[in-house]
Amino acid sequence: NHHVGADSLQKLGSEAHNYYRDGFYAASQDAELKCPDVELNVLISIDDVTDRVQAVITPGTKPEEAFAARRRVMAEIEQESLAATGLRSDVITLYQGGRYHLYRSKKYTDVRLVFAPEQQIAFFGGDADNFEFPRYALDACFFRAYENDKPARVPHHLAWSETRVAAGDLVFVSGHPGHTDRAATVRELESKRDRTIPFALAMLNRLEVLYGAYGAEGPEEKRQALGDLFGAQNGRKSREGVLAGLLDPAVFARKRQTEARLRDLLARDAGDKPSPFERIERAEDEIARVSLRHNLLEGAVGFNSQYFANARTILRAAQEATKPTGDRLREYRDSNRASLEQQLFSTKPIYDAFEIVKLADSLTFLATALGPDDPTVKQVLAGKSPRERAAELIRGTRLGTRAPDAAAAPVTDLRRPLYDGGMAAVAASNDPLILLAQAIDEEARSLRKTVETAGEIKRQAHAEIAQAVFASAGEDRYPDATFTLRLAYGTVLGYDQDGRMIEPITTYAGLFARAAAKHDTPPFDLPPRWQRLRQALEHDQPFLETPFNFVSTADIIGGNSGSPVVNPRGELVGLIFDGNIQSLVLDLAYDDTKARAVSVDAAGILAALRQVYKAEALVAELRGPAAAAAAAAADWRPLFDGRSLAGWKPTPFGGEGEVRIVAGAIEIAQGSDMSGITWGGEFPRQHYEISLDARRVDGSDFFCGLTFPVGDDPCSLIVGGWGGGVVGLSSIDGLDAANNDTTHYHAFTTGEWYAVRVRVTPERIECFINDERVVDQPLAGHALSIRDEVIPSKPLGIATYATTAQLKNIRWRPVAPPTSAAESAP
């Protein structure tokens, strides 16, 4: 997504090149921009290591000892895997401790920017439309992964679909949902409702105001702050949605009912020992006792600066390096070193003025939350105001890549020598932020230990609950989200909102209508490039009708951004970028009544690349060699010149109506009963598409009965039959269009033109009305035929039944066969 790639756009950009605002396109690989500190991971394997992890915990082990033992064995597993495979290795906790799995991933760290749209079209509608639908956002970027300075060659990839999604389609989503609390206890949800979310909202509301005010100082300040502002707004709105669910009495009523059943199940074997639920409640009490200070000090909410983050990383890397890898804080294990170093040594420019504003505000938050007389606050502020102290710290540090400043002398970056020098270099350092990180480190570590120990108590309790559930109901219930790969499925489906039906698919026509309705005022204004092309685009009917965004019932949550949406053939049809406001309750429980995942449509992405950004090379690459070959051969070939019946002749049905040319169209007058035209020239039998526009002028039955060859067999597409509304193929396995699986009903308006298109390959027949797929009929195992009265239309003909119809734009084009068996596989 653009909003995921935004961090890279900000890091690559400058005052002169604002890629976040203005977009970017590399017309060749040489022009691609290398992104600082980006790491892409591709999952290779998953191994169950539950028995090995749980074996180190024996009955009676104290929680802090159990936590240390578990940390050691997980580090051992990760280190052994890294040494054996060279792959990134992470032990993941599932079911809150019921299962442990080892995930191995191939890592790419040379990642380059290929394309990004302007921020205004990627986030059209801004915060007002965020978590809403209908949406009109081109929230997509393209990056290329490299190995050994060459584009990575991968054995598997998703093909870009040539078919658009339609209402009712089945879709699948593979992605990394971040966190859910569906297995949380009532007490844990109460803590989230009463403590965790209110604290986060207080912080995010404050940051939203801060970043907005800083960005209002000028265009460069706006560029620096825009990504952080979006993050604050998005975080605020998402938590408000979760909080609304937690404040719903019905949600807690259902949760209490579920928990009561689990308590009864566990009580049978509990004896006199505290139940898992009671142990979780005590652990929550302990976390609540230290929560505020933990968030401010260990969570660094009170120290909002990239320079401070670098200082803490350098300090703790030196401290932890003196310990065996299994005894270290998790982020400093040997198996995580490469990722840590990539982040620490980012070349992203840091803007001192912005850092001072952020740090001053967070120090103010620290002082007001703990009180000005708190010993830690006094030590941190060192007798100065938050603003003065922030300026002193930022101007005195040398722990980052400073953005160029003509008024300031160059400053040597000390991150690498301090990191490589270990404890001796850190102990000798007088960098003010190293000294600050040292000053709060003992208390911060103590707070972390308290929370981790309580977390271990909860983990063991949840493991008992999970084992009880496994024993009684099996492992059919999937675990809460953990930022690891999950597969979800759903249907492209609208929903009712306040008595109004929300259709599941938006188009580019809707984008322009939305902008016009809002008088093109921010955040509903279009970027300059789109404004320049607007008049032409608004007269391009195929572009206007192209799907832009769509919703589905797929089970997603924060973290799914950028997840591919695929059809049953494994082809990419969209990209998840949001959920509607009703989807935020999915943190607590899945419900498909109104909750929807929001995607940008793959067809909409291609249309923008082709017609707005003129990125033909990228389009050809995305569609793949087979599709590119098809596109190269996709010049439509006319079957009607608009002036004569050349190549066509009236079909001798008997009782047929007159055929004539009227205003550039073929008019087939109503007969008794069938009338039509038959093609007398050459026509392919496979690998082709045929397209035409048809309309009913008078009558009440089918106005387009298109008979076409499928290899050696004929078939007919009936449009508007059996009283005027049936669409389908005649015949499949001896059953006509009204009685087989292709039967589809459509409300056709007399006098209105409809675009009819049929694609024939050896594998299937696909039929489209106004570019909406209405038939997708596989051929394997099925017999094709036509009704006896239609035989005069063979091999290619168009007929009507008791209806006057007009036809125009009759044409065909070849469809290139797959270039290999692998490419033809579904």
Language-model-derived ranges and their functions:
Residues 1-630:
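Terminal presequence/propeptide segments associated with secretion/organelle targeting
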